[in-house]
Structures are given as C-alpha cells and as structure tokens.
C-alpha cells in the first residue's frame, strides 16, 4: 500500500492507474476505521482493479460546537488495517493540503440537506458534498462506496452526482452492526460503558417501528410519537430526530401503507449523537438481511 499525503502525489498515482487501464474503487472516510469501513473496502476491492481510501477529518462538515477537535484519529492504526486489507492507495492529506486557502466554492444540495440530520446540524451536508466533490475530482473513481447507516448522506451524494453528471457510480453498502445490533460508528468510542449498554435502544426502536408497520399502523405521526416515547423510556437516551420519510426524496409521507418508508433516528447519549435508519416495507437484499 502506498501512503499519499499530497494532491500532486495522488494525481500521479491515479494517472498511473489510468494509463494501465485500471478501474478505481474509492472509499472516502474520516478515519478511526471499524469493520463497517473495512466492509466497504472489501466491496471496492472485489469490484475494481485498484482501491483508494481517503482519511480526512473534514472541518467543513463540523459545526462550531461539534466534535472536530476530539474526533478520534489514529493514522498508524488505520494504515495497518488498510495495508492488511490490500488497499492500493491511502490518501491522508492534512487540512492545508485540501484547503490551502479559505474555501469560497461550496457544493450544496439544499432541499435534501436541510432535513433530518441537516435540521439539527445546519451546514453539515454542504460540507460533506463539497469535500466529496473535491475527492471525486482528485481520485476520479469509477465507483465510490458509502455505508447505508448514513442514509441521508448517500441520498445527497447520489443526487449531487446525478445533477452534476459526475462520472462515478455511487454504491450503497448495508449497515454493519455490532453483535447486539448497534450500528458500527467511529463515534461509538465516545460512549461510556453505561451509555454503550443503553445505546441498543436505537436498533430496538427500529425493530419497534417495523413491528408497528407490520401490525398495520398507517399514520406516520403515530409511528413517530410511539418511537420517540420508546426511545425516551431509556433514561440515557435523548431522541433528537425521529422521522418517517420517503426513502427516495426524504419528504414527509402521508401514509405508511402506500409504499416503502424510511425510519430515520438521531439520538443523543450525553454529548454523543448516534444515527441509524431502516427502510421498512421494501423487500430486503440478501446483504441487508445478513447485516441485520
């Protein structure tokens, strides 16, 4: 594996792949890798000739009072994991390499990005789509791989790629979970032992939503209220977003029985926010069945 820290060196490496006629699979990350990231890497390796992973904690997607400074970082650990996974290029720039001057050009998907997580983290998704666009420009991947845990992010990136005619396929990969059902996340490391034990309320709430749907509950507001109450019964959990939405547009829906719906959760444990989601009413893929 080649560790690359500059844009110039990355461009040279990508040009060499292209001269050799190789397809490129790309996994953008913020580091502190877990099995979910490595699952994305494995998929990229299986479907492409060369695999590029980026590690960059992007300041544009953090708000003023968020966890940019304390976001977990361990490049040596991550490099070892990616070396073992057979990655070809690890691109790990610092902030001045990615943003040598204050950035004035922002890529925004405002309608999709202002809902759900975007409603409690204003500006977050504009930071995401801006850095993803820049990374796509640098890596020039044939395919890019994103975890479905960040469902809204995948939806925004897909729409951005469509609107801007970016020549990359966006591949969503089923959420990878811990043994007790909690979605794998770099932020899980923030949780105290008590909070970690309590955090299983999040996937359990998705199970409860699916149960209510199976029983024929049709009113989205009733589902939202029931799930918010279900989560709030855990003293350490504070639900910030509980929403039933259209899985393609993220718009509110009038009925649960008209078609598949997305149940999106954003739950705080102390200063740590965890997100999770599930599309219910749609036949699951074999990959999604295995992940759950």
UniProtKB/Swiss-Prot annotation:
Reaction(s) this enzyme catalyzes, per UniProt: (R)-pantoate + beta-alanine + ATP = (R)-pantothenate + AMP + diphosphate + H(+)
Highest taxon in the source lineage: Bacteria
Binding site for beta-alanine: 61
GO cellular component, one term: cytosol
Enzyme class label: ligase
Assembly and interaction partners: Homodimer.
Active site residues of this protein: 37 (proton donor)
Protein name: Pantothenate synthetase
Pathway in which the depicted protein is active: Cofactor biosynthesis; (R)-pantothenate biosynthesis; (R)-pantothenate from (R)-pantoate and beta-alanine: step 1/1
Organism in which the protein naturally occurs: Agrobacterium fabrum (strain C58 / ATCC 33970)
Gene3D superfamilies xref list: HUPs, Pantoate-beta-alanine ligase, C-terminal domain
Annotated residues for binding of ATP: 30-37, 147-150, 176, 184-187
Coiled-coil ranges per UniProt: none
Remarks, miscellaneous: The reaction proceeds by a bi uni uni bi ping pong mechanism.
Binding residues for (R)-pantoate: 61, 153
Family label: Belongs to the pantothenate synthetase family.
Protein role: Catalyzes the condensation of pantoate with beta-alanine in an ATP-dependent reaction via a pantoyl-adenylate intermediate.
Subcellular location: Cytoplasm
GO MF annotation terms: ATP binding; pantoate-beta-alanine ligase activity
Record key words, sorted: ATP-binding, Cytoplasm, Ligase, Nucleotide-binding, Pantothenate biosynthesis
GO biological process: pantothenate biosynthetic process
EC nos: 6.3.2.1
């Amino acid at each position: 594996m080649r560790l690359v820290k500059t844009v110039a060196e990355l461009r040279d490496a990508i040009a060499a792949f292209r001269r050799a006629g190789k397809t490129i699979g790309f996994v953008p990350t913020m580091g502190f890798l877990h099995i979910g990231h490595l699952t994305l890497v494995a998929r990229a390796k299986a479907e492409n000739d060369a695999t590029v992973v980026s590690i960059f904690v992007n300041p544009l997607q953090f708000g003023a009072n968020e966890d940019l400074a304390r976001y977990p970082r361990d490049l040596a650990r991550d490099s070892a994991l990616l070396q073992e996974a057979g990655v070809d290029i690890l691109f790990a720039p610092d902030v001045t390499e990615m943003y040598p001057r204050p950035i004035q050009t922002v890529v925004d998907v405002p309608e999709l990005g202002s809902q759900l997580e975007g409603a409690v983290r204003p500006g977050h998704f504009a930071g995401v789509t801006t850095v993803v666009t820049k990374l796509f420009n640098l890596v020039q991947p044939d395919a890019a791989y994103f975890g479905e845990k960040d469902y809204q992010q995948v939806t925004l990136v897909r729409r951005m790629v469509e609107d801007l005619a970016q020549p990359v396929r966006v591949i969503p990969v089923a959420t990878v979970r811990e043994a007790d059902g909690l979605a794998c996340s770099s932020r899980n490391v923030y949780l105290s032992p008590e909070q970690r034990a309590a955090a299983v309320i999040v996937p359990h709430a998705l199970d409860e939503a699916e149960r209510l749907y199976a029983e024929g509950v049709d009113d989205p507001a009733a589902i939202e209220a029931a799930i918010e109450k279900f989560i709030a019964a855990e003293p350490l959990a504070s639900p910030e977003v509980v929403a039933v939405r259209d899985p393609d547009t993220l718009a509110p829906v009038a009925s649960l029985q008209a078609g598949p719906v997305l149940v999106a959760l954003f739950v705080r444990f102390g200063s740590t926010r965890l997100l999770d989601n599930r599309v219910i009413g749609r036949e699951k893929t074999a990959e999604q069945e295995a992940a759950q």
